[in-house]
Structures are given as C-alpha cells and as structure tokens.
C-alpha cells in the first residue's frame, strides 16, 4: 500500500474509531454466526423420515417470539408461520413470554414462567431458543457475567429431556432504537459474542436472526419488535436451519 494511502487510512481510522469498530464487530459476528448456521445444516438437520411420530418443535423466547406488536398476532407470530410452512409432520408451539430474560436473576426470568414449565412438559424434539433482547436492559445486564452459565444451564435442561431434542440458538434481532432499556450496543458487543462462543463450545448451531433482520427498520414499527413481514423472515430462517436448507 502506498505511504500516502496508508496514512490517510490510519487517519480516518482514528477520526472515526468508534464507528469503524462497531462496523467491524457487527461484520465479524455476522460472518461467524453465518458459518455456524451453515455447518449446522449439514450436521443437525431434522429428517422427518427419522421420526415415527409428529415432530414437536418448541419456540422458546421473549416478546419477539410471542409476536408482540404484530397486528394479527394469533396468526402471524413466527412460530405459527413456521408451523404452517413445515406442515402436518410438525407440531410447532409458541412458548414466548413478553419481557422474559434468559438470566435467572433478570427482572422477568424465563426460568420462573409457566411457559418454561410448559415447554419442558411438551418434551420437544426440536428447541429453538431466542432469548437475550431483554437481558440488555441495565437492571438485567448488571448480571452479564452470569449470562453464559445460565444459557448453558438452559441448554442442558432441554438436552436432558426424554426426547433428546436437537437445539438451535438464535442471535437477537437488531435494535433500531434504544427503548425500555433495550439497546443495540449490548446486543452486538455483549449478547451475540457470548451466544457465538457458547454455541461453539457446545457444538450447537446458531440461527443468525440479527443479519436476517438487519437493514430493515421498516419492519420494526416500534424499533424493537418485528411486524408480520419480519416474523415471516424469522420463520423462514428457522425453517431453513431445521431442515438444513
């Protein structure tokens, strides 16, 4: 690289370092998550022919899984859309809880909800976990050091069920505006790297919902929750992961 160009690049880096680093972090996380999802397609895809019963899919999550903010929530939340697309061989249930955290010490811990108990009793063959958005709230993220241990405990809990389910982790959706304490910085620099590292250590796939929903602010009327179109994109990403497409 010519010296003049190199110096201009270095100068630009120092002048815009925070923006530059944010872009680099997002890009690296997206690439890594995408690689994990691709690898999982080969090794963990669900083959309906391998099951002699209806395949039970538990969608564990927060308000985004629940479908908060969607006009026709009952029919357009992502687990319902996923179930319609997968067809009669699958039974997909929505175990989303608005405001829920993965953290056990969160202000509304998923561990303490009836939905967690119901998801356990469902004895799923497939578990899709999408928790982390509410964990970024300041009152919750003060327990950030506990996030990975609590996530691993949840993975181990579901993995020990009689059906021995296949488990997918999801990266959170983008945060287009800080609201209710939910913020993009903690998602990108806190949640996603932790999910990625944990998935690698546990040998589990990650569904990269962050990338799937990035650059689409029009699908987030309140800047946090996707609308029906966004929920459809989520369902498509989850289906592709489950079926190994």
Regions found by a protein language model. Name each.
Residues 91-93, 166, 203-205:
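Conserved beta-strand segments of alpha/beta enzyme cores
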Residues 130-134, 155-189:
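Active-site segments of SGNH/GDSL-like serine hydrolases
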Residues 70, 108, 173-245:
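Catalytic His-Asp segment of secreted/periplasmic serine-dependent ester chemistry enzymes
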Residues 61, 96, 171, 210:
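Active-site beta-alpha turn of Rossmann-fold NAD(P)-dependent dehydrogenases/reductases
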Residues 146-149, 153-157, 190-197:
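Alpha-helical scaffolding segments of alpha/beta enzyme cores, especially the outer helices
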Residues 1-60, 64-73, 80-89, 120-125, ...:
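N-terminal secretory targeting modules
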Residues 50-58, 64-152, 176, 186:
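Conserved SGNH/GDSL esterase-like catalytic core that processes O-acyl groups on lipids
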């Amino acid at each position: 690289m010519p010296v003049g160009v190199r110096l201009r690049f270095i100068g630009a880096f120092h002048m815009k370092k925070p923006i530059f680093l944010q872009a680099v972090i997002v890009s690296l996380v997206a690439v890594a998550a995408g690689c994990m999802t691709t690898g999982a397609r080969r090794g963990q895809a669900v083959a309906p022919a391998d099951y002699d019963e209806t395949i039970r899919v538990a969608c564990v999550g927060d308000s985004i899984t629940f479908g908060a903010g969607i006009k026709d929530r009952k029919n357009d939340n992502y687990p319902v859309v996923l179930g319609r697309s997968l067809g009669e061989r699958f039974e997909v249930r929505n175990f989303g809880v608005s405001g829920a955290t993965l953290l056990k010490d969160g202000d509304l811990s998923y561990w303490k909800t009836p939905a967690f108990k119901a998801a356990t009793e469902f004895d799923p063959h497939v578990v899709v976990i999408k928790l982390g958005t509410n964990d970024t709230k300041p009152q919750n993220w003060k327990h950030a050091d506990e996030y990975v241990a609590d996530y691993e405990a949840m993975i181990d809990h579901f993995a020990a069920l009689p059906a021995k389910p296949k488990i997918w982790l999801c990266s959170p959706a983008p945060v287009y505006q800080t609201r209710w304490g939910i913020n993009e910085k903690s998602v990108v620099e806190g949640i996603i790297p932790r999910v990625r590292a944990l998935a690698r250590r546990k040998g589990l796939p990650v569904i990269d919902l962050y990338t799937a929903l990035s650059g689409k602010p029009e699908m987030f009327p309140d800047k946090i929750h996707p609308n029906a179109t966004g929920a459809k994109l989520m369902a498509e990403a989850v289906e592709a992961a489950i079926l190994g497409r």
